[in-house]
From Swiss-Prot:
EC number, as in UniProt: 5.1.1.1
Keyword annotations of the record: Isomerase, Pyridoxal phosphate
Gene3D superfamilies: Alanine racemase (3.20.20.10), Lyase, Ornithine Decarboxylase, Chain A, domain 1 (2.40.37.10)
Catalytic activity field: L-alanine = D-alanine
PROSITE patterns: ALANINE_RACEMASE
Family, similarity comment: Belongs to the alanine racemase family.
Molecular function terms, GO-annotated: alanine racemase activity; pyridoxal phosphate binding
The name this protein goes by in its record: Alanine racemase
Any one Gene Ontology cellular component term annotated for this protein: cytosol
Length: 356
């Protein structure tokens, strides 16, 4: 028998989450962001649930080719652009849309002769200070690209650093307004947080990522609890052993947790080598036999321990939900001092993914 841990991905929930995104941005088209192997859900899995999207956005040229070969004929956006001039031949062949964020990329485009004009997303650094042209340099970059006969639609793009925080988007939107003054063309600005909470940013295209998979861009599930968004992935396993630990007994590596009275402790077939956060402390929420309880002690490579005091019927073989509908991935991430983004994308290849 295989190890009982499995990640179940519900493509119907993915489609429902996309519909909710559309209700938040009814006038915009949607780039469904499927980078990092579909946020850990599996590109081959998630694209089936996102067939009604307007386009897919990702990083890897190979994954873009995979989508084309699977039959996707709509737009595909390369979020980091191309990494060397030779990539342009693949972009041309598979009719991909590329981000441009550096002068050398403009020069490479100038030198190429594509079979048909390409759609380009010109990236503005409006305050993230990661990729993109400065406010001062952007108009010149726009003019250079706009002068090329083999550039079709030129879209202004930027990325918000604080859309999920009190600072919001106002400062960066002011930069976008100044840099884009007089530049006619579509705008693509809104990430997940801006799609939900800043409608003035929506423009012609929005780029939802984490919310498609049913987690919060802020890391706080309560921020999206009323939205109708649901987790797409359920990571589940089983109890593979039950221990009766006497009063004073210590749990796991380093004995980080000591029980004050005789305690039933369950052992779950899941550890940090499966993608569960190693730094999740005692008290991290978990569901055992339909009852919400918590972890005990340090997470091991292949196993973790759970408190069964509230689960009197739990036994070997009882179902365990690590995260999903009942224990949100944001809750587990917050307990471990990280974000749902990291946990999703860190799901280990050894975990079987099932589509339902």
């Amino acid at each position: 028998m295989p190890r009982p841990i499995v990640a179940k991905v519900d493509s119907a929930v993915l489609a429902s989450n996309l519909s909710i995104v559309r209700r938040h941005a009814p006038q915009a088209q949607v780039w469904s962001v499927v980078k990092a192997n579909g946020y850990g859900h599996g590109l081959n899995t998630v694209w089936q649930g996102l067939q009604q999207t307007d386009g897919f956005a990702l990083l890897d040229l190979h994954e873009a080719v995979v989508l084309r070969e699977k039959g996707w004929r709509g737009p595909i956006l390369l979020l980091e652009g191309f990494f060397q001039p030779a990539d342009l031949a693949v972009i041309d062949r598979y009719r991909l849309t590329t981000v441009v964020h550096s002068d050398w990329q403009i020069e490479a485009l100038r030198r190429m002769t594509p079979r048909a004009p390409l759609d380009i997303y010109l990236k503005l650094n409006s305050g993230m200070n990661r990729l993109g042209f400065s406010e001062r340099a952007l108009p010149g970059a726009w003019q250079s690209l706009n002068a090329l006969k083999h550039v079709a639609t030129l879209t202004l793009m930027s990325h918000f650093a604080y859309a999920d925080m009190p600072e919001g988007v106002e400062g960066q939107m002011a930069v976008v307004a100044r840099a884009g003054e007089g530049l006619t063309g579509p705008r693509c600005l809104a990430n997940s947080a801006a799609t939900l909470w800043h409608p003035a940013t929506h423009g012609q295209w929005v780029r939802p990522g984490i919310i498609l998979y049913g987690a919060s861009p802020s890391g706080n599930w309560q921020d999206i609890a009323a939205s109708g968004l649901r987790p797409v992935m359920t990571l589940q396993s089983e109890l593979i052993a039950v221990q009766s630990v006497p009063a004073g007994g210590r749990i796991g590596y380093g004995g980080r947790h000591r029980v004050s009275e005789t305690h039933r402790v369950g052992v779950v077939a899941c550890g940090y080598a499966d993608g569960y956060p190693r730094h999740a402390p005692t008290g991290t929420p978990i569901l055992v036999d339909g009852v919400r309880t918590s972890t005990l002690g340090a997470v091991s490579m292949d196993m973790l321990m759970v408190d069964l005091q509230l689960c009197p019927k739990a036994r070997i073989g009882s179902a365990v939900e690590l995260w999903g509908d009942h224990v949100k991935i944001d809750e587990v991430a917050a307990s471990a001092g990280t974000l749902g983004y990291e946990l999703m994308s860190a799901l280990a290849p050894r975990v079987t993914v099932q589509i339902r």
